[in-house]
A protein has these predicted regions:
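Extended amphipathic alpha-helical scaffolds
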Residues: 1-190
Length: 190
């Protein structure tokens, strides 16, 4: 741990984790100042190798909330159906616009991301990763100095964290998730 001698913060063994990626040899092992996880990157065209990304951490889903009550919608003509579909599309656009207004270009969440919202985010240069467990959510927030967000509509600029780099590596398909996402050069790597 020569690399960390003289660090201005207390470093404990609890601040370290070891991830085996199955790539390379022990000589290629390295220490990162951040967090690494295995999650599926949603698309080959997702942004990669982000430099100085702004990081947004969301505890739940990024999608329109499901109704808790059963509702029946009666549609008597195609115009009514079109307006219903348009209203849903506008709600999704409002969610993606709210996220993009924060200037975050790396977003992680504990739940699912609606595919239409995911498409808009990716098209705008935002790497969005879904399905993190609560421990991963807390680790990403800790190392990037982000505030974990519970409601997308309550996001403000003070909740956004940052990192030095975010990159992902896709491995050949198998029965396991093989994408390795690395958040490095973080302001608070512990």
């Amino acid at each position: 741990l020569e690399v960390l001698k003289g660090a201005d913060q207390d470093i404990s063994t609890e601040s370290f984790g070891m991830i085996k990626t199955g790539m390379g040899t022990q000589e290629r092992s390295r220490l990162i100042m951040g967090f690494q996880m295995r999650k599926r990157v949603p698309s080959e065209s997702a942004p990669n190798n982000l430099e100085n990304p702004n990081v947004l951490v969301i505890r739940g889903d990024i999608k329109i909330r499901k109704m808790t009550r059963t509702a029946e919608v009666r549609v008597s003509n195609s115009d009514e159906l079109d307006s219903f579909i348009e209203a849903e599309k506008e709600r999704k656009t409002k969610i993606s616009d709210k996220i993009m207004s924060t200037s975050a270009n790396f977003v992680v969440c504990g739940g699912e991301i609606d595919r239409d919202i995911l498409y808009e985010l990716s098209r705008s240069g935002v790497l969005a990763i879904q399905g993190l467990d609560s421990s991963e959510i807390e680790q990403v927030a800790l190392c990037t100095n982000s505030v974990v967000v519970d409601s997308i509509m309550d996001i403000d600029q003070t909740m956004i964290g940052n990192a030095g780099t975010v990159s992902w590596t896709r491995r050949p398909s198998s029965d396991q998730v093989e994408d390795i996402i690395e958040i490095d050069n973080c302001p608070s790597p512990g």
